[in-house]
């Protein structure tokens, strides 16, 4: 009788564990952001010469495979859609947890987003959904996560259960994990029709516009972190954009201002 009870208990526990694992794997948001970051953590430890940090400018404009074919260096983008400067410090720590790159290139458009572009919880989850459990993950969630939804950052299926976002590119993510590496090295993009309206010419334009106070404060805080930690392998960039509207031109001008602030801290 006792043997039968033990056997039944083992079966129940096994079923519960299997159900938990299935929910954990299948009920997560699967999109290009998760596939890209999951792929980053699959890269061999300390195998990357360059890591690029930023938002869509990085993974749509730079090809790690082409860079290797043309110039012989290994690289990977640690980048998510609409990634913003608040998260850069945590992301630097994530990069350093598995890689020791000769260069970390940071595309800084994410320092110029206005409040309308800061749906912060969505952007945070694009990062934390792929992060392995670590002190940095705990610190990041404690600093930026919603107090009422703490559990869902560690168990994403709590958040995405029954959601269409849990399906997304699930087959692609399964293929990634079966393959064990990212075939495209994080690159992603989509086709668009060519813009036929007026494009503002900014060649040689050095005009500046003040950054909002909160934006400048966060930028300076991140730069101070880089300086205090002697991150000599960090360089900053602002990838080119087609400027078609006044608000984009003003962001371009703020980019010029940002460049001057970056120089104040001794960085290029």
Give the positions of each predicted feature.
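Extended hydrophobic/aromatic segments used for targeting, binding, or gating
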Residues: 214, 221-223, 227-229, 233-268
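Short catalytic/ligand-binding loop motif for oxyanion handling, primarily in non-cytosolic enzymes
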Residues: 60, 112-116, 166-168, 243-246
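Hydrophobic membrane-insertion alpha-helices, especially the h-region
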Residues: 7-27
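Short hydrophobic beta-strand that contains or immediately precedes a catalytic carboxylate
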Residues: 50-54
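Secreted/periplasmic serine-hydrolase-like ester/acetyl group-modifying domain
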Residues: 123-230
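Alpha-helical transmembrane signal-anchor/signal-peptide segments
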Residues: 28-48
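Membrane-embedded segments
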Residues: 57-144
């Amino acid at each position: 009788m006792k043997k039968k009870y033990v056997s039944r208990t083992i079966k129940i526990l096994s079923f519960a564990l299997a159900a938990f694992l299935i929910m954990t794997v299948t009920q997560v948001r699967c999109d290009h952001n998760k596939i890209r970051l999951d792929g980053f953590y699959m890269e061999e430890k300390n195998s990357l010469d360059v890591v690029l940090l930023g938002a869509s400018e990085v993974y749509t404009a730079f090809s790690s495979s082409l860079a290797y074919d043309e110039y012989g260096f290994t690289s990977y983008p640690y980048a998510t859609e609409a990634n913003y400067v608040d998260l850069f410090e945590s992301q630097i720590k994530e990069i350093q947890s598995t890689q020791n790159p000769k260069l970390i290139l940071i595309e800084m458009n994410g320092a110029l987003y206005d409040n309308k572009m800061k749906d912060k919880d969505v952007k945070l989850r694009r990062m934390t959904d792929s992060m392995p459990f670590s002190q940095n993950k705990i610190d990041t969630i404690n600093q930026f996560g919603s107090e009422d939804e703490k559990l869902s950052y560690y168990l994403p299926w709590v958040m995405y259960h029954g959601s269409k976002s849990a399906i997304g590119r699930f087959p692609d993510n399964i293929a990634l994990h079966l393959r064990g590496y990212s075939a495209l090295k994080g690159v992603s993009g989509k086709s668009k029709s060519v813009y036929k309206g007026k494009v503002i010419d900014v060649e040689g334009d050095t005009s500046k516009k003040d950054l909002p106070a909160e934006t400048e404060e966060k930028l300076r805080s991140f730069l101070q972190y880089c300086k205090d930690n002697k991150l000599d392998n960090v360089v900053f960039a602002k990838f080119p954009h087609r400027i078609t509207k006044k608000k984009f031109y003003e962001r371009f001008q703020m980019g010029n201002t940002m460049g001057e602030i970056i120089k104040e801290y001794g960085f290029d």
